[in-house]
């Protein structure tokens, strides 16, 4: 009797942790991705990177630019694999119009936040973002450090009681 393969609990393929550090995220939207077969196989193997990716608009359509999906070594040899190709985002017209209008405001951009599986479909969570200044980043770090210190103090206070 063979053992069943244990499936990982997490459906997340790739995260863009840098985006939350560098930007204020105003709004989040889920979008589908138009992928080729070798890209799906590579994503299942966890070979995706969205750290420097963002959304661009061309001819009324949205595209994910800068995402890197490395091809597997065992991928087909007769297909040319471009790891950094621009991938089309699958959104309905209302979402596209809304995103386009919001992104055209001063200081706003659209960045990829995470790449994950939703049942059998690959989805990307994109966020409407506004850039942070250096002082804002410092404030976030101070706030995070204070939270850790406060938790440590509370933990020690409960032990002494």
Curated annotation (Swiss-Prot):
Entry-linked SUPFAM superfamilies: Small protein B (SmpB)
GO CC, any one term: cytosol
Gene Ontology biological process terms, A to Z: trans-translation
Domain of life: Bacteria
Keywords: Cytoplasm, RNA-binding
Protein's UniProt keywords contain Cell membrane: no
Molecular function terms, GO-annotated: RNA binding
Regions that span the bilayer: none
InterPro entries per record: SmpB, SsrA-bd_prot, SsrA-bd_prot_CS
Keyword Membrane part of the UniProt annotation: no
Outcome of gene disruption: Essential, it cannot be disrupted.
Subcellular location: Cytoplasm
Pfam families per UniProt: SmpB
Family: Belongs to the SmpB family.
Alphabetized NCBIfam families for the sequence: PRK05422.1, smpB
Functional note: Required for rescue of stalled ribosomes mediated by trans-translation. Binds to transfer-messenger RNA (tmRNA), required for stable association of tmRNA with ribosomes. tmRNA and SmpB together mimic tRNA shape, replacing the anticodon stem-loop with SmpB. tmRNA is encoded by the ssrA gene; the 2 termini fold to resemble tRNA(Ala) and it encodes a 'tag peptide', a short internal open reading frame. During trans-translation Ala-aminoacylated tmRNA acts like a tRNA, entering the A-site of stalled ribosomes, displacing the stalled mRNA.
Protein name, UniProt field: SsrA-binding protein
Organism listed in the record: Haemophilus influenzae (strain ATCC 51907 / DSM 11121 / KW20 / Rd)
